[in-house]
Amino acid sequence: MNPSRTILNAVRACAVILLTACVSPAWCLDGSPDSVDQVRIRARALGLHPGQFQPGPLNAITDVPGVKVGQVTLMQGDGPLQPGQGPVRTGVTVIVPRDDVWHKKVPAGSFVLNGTGEMTGLSWVAESGFLEYPIALTNTLNVPRVANGVISWMLKQYPGIGITDDTLTPVVAECDDGRLNDIQGRHVSETDVMRALDEASSGPVAEGSVGAGTGMISYGFKGGIGTASRRLPEANGGFTIGVLVNANHGRRPELTMGGVPVGQRYGAAPTQSSQSPDQNSSSLHASREGTSGNAEGSIIVVIATDAPLDGRQLTRLGKRAALGLARTGSTARHGSGDFMLAFSTGNVIPHYPSDPTFSLTHLADTHLNPVMTATVEATEEAILN
């Protein structure tokens, strides 16, 4: 069989699915989490297999031992935008690096490809080289409320915080879902965040219009949460690399699948001028078409691995995730917020150790190449998913 033809057929199949999920008022405002799940097909099932390494059993960030993901999806109401009331298409996604991460910190590093956005807490990650609490993803205006939820959950787990123990600066990353969601309503509550954290699990990860991805648009199509993983051969250490993204970036002509410029082949995203007057007057989508409808968007990439890496090496992994982003067509536009955060469960950094020194296992830089390659591959596939 001709490999090029196989890839092209897979890309065509993906494009058909994408076109059925185009950003349109009817789809966006009449859908539900259940109906979205029923049409979800992952890229690999269609014949797209980015890269050379094999995925883990779940092909998800939760293939990395100990990593958990929790999500709460808020989808309520329809019709025209009523600021502060609805329609609601938003949520929160949390990644828990390991149990008791406060006392068993994970090495971490970050990379900002383009900074039109926010991921709180990065200054401390850069300074310390570790991560000591869960990561939360949500929409732009909900960052303070979600941070409050993370703090409340941490205080419940560790009552000494701020009294007999350190304080904390939560890591909360945002994308703007205001084109499909009443973002002024800031509908994600402290309770929602604590529920996502309490229900976080190490099993399969729901993708697409769930959690923080509920209102996101990517490459002019419905975007949101995606995940993928790679498991290296034993000859390369047998390590697992997992990636989770919240994709809200790119314009349709940029979308590339398997090296094929799908976005150019299948038309431009809907614009206000291409819709009927009735559509324009009855949709939340239309209300922001003249502003954020043409915005650059953002993407959050979270990378987990059990390879024993330090903060410097994990920052290097974050940079490689940007290459996976580029393989899907992104050029990290001026107005895009492209944030990468990587952590390793391969070592434990103790909380105020009694001894002045402690030991860490360290993967030599000369053996990093397979881990870097796997990061690129998993990032690309997570975005496609």
Q: Where in this protein do the model-derived segments appear?
A:
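Bacterial N-terminal signal peptides
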Residues: 12-25
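Serine residues within intrinsically disordered or low-complexity segments
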Residues: 4, 24, 282-283
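Alpha/propeptide regions of enzymes that mature by internal proteolysis
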Residues: 29-385
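Bacterial N-terminal signal peptides that target proteins for export
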Residues: 2-15
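Leucine-biased recognition of intrinsically disordered, low-complexity hydrophobic segments
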Residues: 8, 18-19, 29, 284
